[in-house]
Amino acid sequence: MNLTINALTRNYQGKGANRRLRRNNKIPAIVYGTGKPPSKITLDIFEITHLLKNEETYTSVLNLIVNKNKEAVIIKNLQRHPAKNSITHIDFLRINLNQSIITSIPIQFNGEEDNKAMRLGAVLNQFMTAIEISCLPTNLPHSINVDISHLTIGEHINLTDINIPKGIVITALTHGDIETHNQSIAIIQEPRKMAEIEENILVKAEDSKNKITKDNETNKDKSNL
């Protein structure tokens, strides 16, 4: 996929300047990496919003053109307004196409319709939604596909069970002791088990709330002494 983003350098910074940019349908951004100084830029809100409608934009190598100069980048961080969900700022990371990069890629679970246990009412409990990987930019996948069609009730799928494409490394499994870092990413569970887990979470939250209230009352009593 060949995706291009046009940008202009900006000389002003700060909350006031950024608000003025957004009022004029521009988004503040920054690009850094490969040993070069960071560069503050502005993006057209309509262009970047259109590109981000395609989920693959988040995990693709992008052509960033700043004042007619082209650089290869990936989106490193994207900030949104907490209430409006509109884009407020983007960080781009410059990359060398001949050097490996480390980034997080979303997990795509496949085979739910073919899973016998799930057809009978079992549910998939996900522990992870993304995996940190290392690879050359040219090998960067848009998602990590995980087949769960064969899983039975109570069966986990771990990092080492994932069929990773050639040229891609799961960083968690490069720290020496694979057994220690071989995390479970999902399990097939009975609906009853899921309900018990949710109930336990609620009970723990309530216990924690009661403890805080009790501690506050104790501290209040002490302050009156």
Curated annotation (Swiss-Prot):
Chain positions covered by the region annotation Disordered: 206-225
Source taxon at top rank: Bacteria
One GO term describing the cellular component: cytosolic large ribosomal subunit
Molecular functions (GO terms): 5S rRNA binding; structural constituent of ribosome
UniProt KW Ribonucleoprotein keyword: yes
The keyword Amino-acid biosynthesis is assigned to this record: no
HAMAP family: Ribosomal_bL25, Ribosomal_bL25_CTC
Family label: Belongs to the bacterial ribosomal protein bL25 family. CTC subfamily.
Protein name: Large ribosomal subunit protein bL25
Organism: Vesicomyosocius okutanii subsp. Calyptogena okutanii (strain HA)
